Amino acid sequence: PEQGAGVIALKVPGVQATDEQRRYYPAAEVTAHIVGFTDIDETGQEGLELAYNDWLSGQPGKRRTLKDRKGRLARQAELIESASPGKELMLSIDLRLQYMAYRELRQAVEKHRASAGSLVMLDVKTGEVLAMVNQPVYNPNNRSDMQAYKMRNRVLTDMVEPGSTLKPFTVAAALESGQFQKNSVINTSPGIMRLGRDKVKDIRNYGSIDITTVLRKSSNIGVSKMALTIGPDKVMDLLQRVGLGQSTGTGFPGESAGYLPFRDRWSDIEIATLSFGYGLTVTPLQLAQAYTVLGSGGILRPVSLIKRDVIPDGIRVLDQRIANDLRNMLREVVHGGTGGRAQIDAFEVGGKTGTARKVGENGYSKDRYIGMFAGLAPINDPRLAIVVVIDDPTGQAYYGGLTAAPVFSNVAAGALRLLGVEPAGNAVSSTSSTSSTSSTSSSIAYVPWRLPLEEKFMGPILAPELNSVQNIALKKG
């Protein structure tokens, strides 16, 4: 700008200044994967800028004029078509939660030296996306840093095998079949199950365990035996009903539908591996939407990145009692199971860890993994469904319970406090769509969580604004 002003000050004949508007993104990389960016002509190229380009751009008007052969105006301009300005677009994203999720995910990816990471947070009550972040990122205000691998919105575009995060849905299908009850006992001895030439293994021999323990210990043999008993069709039917294998309907450019394997004939090992999340792929957003079904008592609602004026009723895809039973089981996974690091102070949460082997050129890798955690908070009356993916951690820890669960814990704790959600009873009723109304023990301390805002990431314009919003939220709490 200083150089430009200096040139204009020279008053060189034929040189003049023209004002041009350019998009500036105050949240920069924090919302880059959602908002996207425009080109030099202000045409959307990525993200919601592309998806809603016509809505945001409006339409230019038209005027007709008549000039003589010397270019002089012979008739006043006549309006042919009025211009229509672009319309506003209100996103469902809560910028406080978005920043917090961005910060926690970035720190986890750096800590575990992972190649990438994703986190998505859905409002269980509405289906709205409250936060959606990825690593690595790019800054839309710095076009020189736009590399393809940084620009991908992995929450919607990247498909992963869900691993053990899928096990709750295998259990749901088993309960739905009537062939298993929540107190059914499954013999997993001796910790290895042979299926022809293949084997299914648990980490250790858990012996005879009930279904809750199958999830708490993440027993591959337990869910395999359930799936083999009820057959793959019942499992596949449930997976389709909760939204897997199909687009979530956000309208986001490049969203993947995932993959569900439909076969005329299934081998035993194919049924077994399906039961614990191999042989199919999902996006993190699809997985989060599926978990909202458990959180809402069996109701599936479409996902939206746009703020909703009217909350859709959704459709019932799972019996309410089964959904609530699963929530109680997921609570046990966090309390005494593989998801212990997902716990948060003052709130009860539930969820499932997952650790899937990455696929390489020669099949499944022996030393490369994807760590995941999918959960609900608070578990008694879920408000949030959160999925965390840590891709290819190269540090000492790679299990989802060690890499992704702590991120869930930090993000869920901050989000519940910022949203003003009060701690409540912990038990989930099997027959009620709402939580137990018993109050929390007075021994549990409820400490308001404060969002650390850094100008370094949010920019000098936005950080103070968010601080003031946060202060209001804390005062209300």
Where are these regions (language model features)?
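Short, small/polar residue-rich loop motifs at catalytic or cofactor-binding pockets
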Residues: 60, 113-116, 187
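Flexible, solvent-exposed loop/hinge segments and secondary-structure transition points
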Residues: 11-12, 42, 105-126, 134, ...
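Conserved, well-ordered alpha-helix/loop/beta-strand core segments that scaffold catalytic motifs
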Residues: 74-117
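Ligand-recognition elements built from short beta-strands and adjacent flexible loops
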Residues: 260, 346, 410-477
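Beta-lactam-recognizing serine transpeptidase/beta-lactamase-like catalytic domain environment
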Residues: 67-78, 119, 123-164, 169-394, ...
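Extracytoplasmic/secreted proteins, especially bacterial periplasmic and envelope-associated proteins
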Residues: 2, 6, 29, 33, ...
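Soluble periplasmic/extracytoplasmic beta-strand elements of cell-envelope proteins
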Residues: 6, 16-18, 33-37, 55, ...
